[in-house]
């Protein structure tokens, strides 16, 4: 069975992590080739793309401009600053934050481009919600409602 067949099933909600990482040993040209293949697979299968990016923001932006995706692109574990976050949000990227985040980046993504995650860390997701709500100076319930709305891009209910 090929990858396309496997990811087309209802049990798969996204493609990823697709990555561009300047600290990785793989040459960037190869990383971009594989990344673009995964991005195109996400488009073909109508799935969001989960992205791992380390110090390759210009390459990532160039890839997005080349693909012109209709499906959401979500940057996993975003820890950049508010200026970078604002630039990425203006370009239509969603940002997912874990237990370590820059408060100005959170504000740049709030409300519509924000996701939260744990990435199998020792902190519970409830702790992430609590810390992010505090950083945004909003009630935790308001954050929960907005994240649920943002998650609806995955169309998990059909």
Predicted regions and their residues:
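Active-site regions of enzymes building and remodeling cell-envelope glycoconjugates
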Residues: 12, 92-93, 112-114
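Short acidic/histidine-rich active-site segments
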Residues: 112-124
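Divalent metal-binding pocket/active-site signature
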Residues: 4-90, 138
């Amino acid at each position: 069975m090929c990858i396309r067949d496997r990811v087309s099933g209802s049990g798969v909600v996204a493609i990823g992590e697709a990555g561009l990482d300047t600290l990785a040993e793989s040459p960037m040209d190869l990383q971009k080739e594989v990344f673009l293949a995964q991005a195109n697979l996400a488009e073909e299968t109508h799935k969001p793309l989960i992205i791992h990016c380390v110090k390759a923001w210009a390459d990532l932006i160039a890839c997005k401009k080349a693909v012109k995706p209709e499906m959401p692109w979500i940057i996993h574990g975003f820890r950049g600053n508010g200026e970078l976050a604002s630039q990425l949000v203006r370009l239509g990227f969603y940002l997912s934050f874990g237990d370590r985040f820059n408060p100005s980046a959170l504000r740049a993504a709030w409300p519509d481009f924000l996701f939260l995650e744990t990435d199998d860390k020792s902190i519970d997701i409830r702790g992430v919600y609590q810390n992010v709500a505090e950083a945004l100076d909003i009630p935790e319930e308001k954050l929960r409602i907005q994240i649920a709305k943002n998650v609806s891009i995955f169309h998990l209910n059909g």
